[in-house]
Amino acid sequence: MVVGFLGTNSIQISSKRILCPVSGFDSYGTISIEDNHISALSKREAATSSDALPDSAFVLPGIIDLHCHVGSHQSIYGVDPVRILKSGTTVACSQGDAGAATIDQYVAEVIAVAPLYVKLAINLSSIGESTEEGCFSLSEWIDVAACIDAIDRHRDSVWAVSVNTSHHACPELDPRSLLKAGLKVAAETGLPILYGMRRPEDWSLADQLALLRPGDVVTYCFRKTPHCIVENGRVLECVLDARVRGVLFDVGHGCGSFDFDVAESAVRCGFLPDTISTDLQTGHVTNNILHDLPLVMSKLRAVGMQELDIFRAVTETPAKIINEPKRGSLCAGSIADLTVLMESESACQLTDTNGNMRCGKVWTGRQLGS
């Protein structure tokens, strides 16, 4: 790779491979940057001896993690944003780390000062993820009007309303009432829902999905238990119907929400996740578990998802979902967020959250310039 500084605000970056899912560009190339925005993307005939990166390295639009936990002091699940940036992720979307009662502090102490771009799926629970108890343990933590007001105060920082109806999040409250309240907030504010499913013995998955709207996002889509979108190797009809209606599906790997068998069955059936995300949280840090977005991308490749679909699921698609049209692309006018990915020379052992194994080459990433 060659980085040329043409002036105070002008840079040219050349690499053996530059890839942009939006434009279809995949070639030797040069990215021209003016005032932190891309001014041009052009092909080169061949690599040169001055290209410093190995052959396996290439440049993508800055990758976007649609579901993670950001902010090491503001949420019990939150991770230092510096850790996220080091893996090459340039946009981190917090899943419910702040609610109406905590969003002002979260914006000031995380979003405003983080070294990468952070957007929030505001928690329907006013306390966010600030307690070891489930965020919907008490009914008084659900305040539709307060949530709407918080979104209005921080419209530029909020991309969705987070409604996690899992048994852990709401052990006593009726999950139907939670989703109803979340949908009211979403309708009033024009935002999508980021939805965590309830176990089917409490509420059928078909009935849950039927309430979601086009543009709403279901996370933890490749979990095996207590809910699963696959049965006997086939994707459930209610899940396929939801996708036809425009409901979106996100990986949300986490500490217990990614199963190779489920993912492999879904991919084999042509059911690809719309977005790939880590659900990175303190459990990964405290247990010294290597976990980042390029690694989760590698796991999707190991179950048969094609590279271009993977790259799109961490750039173009999440940028659209969070309403950031100048991100996730290398087209002229886009913000100059860039990620460098490098591929391992040989296959490595990959593990899902249930201890199952697959083998595959692994991507590692860094932000360009880091």
Please state what every model-predicted region is.
Residues V82-H167:
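Divalent-metal coordination cores built from histidine and acidic residues
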Residues T165-A266, G270-N287:
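Active-site core of metal-dependent hydrolases
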Residues K16, N36, S56, H67, ...:
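Divalent metal-coordination and catalytic microenvironments
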Residues I64-C68, A92-S94, V118-I122, W159-V163, ...:
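Hydrophobic faces of well-ordered beta-strands that scaffold small-molecule active sites
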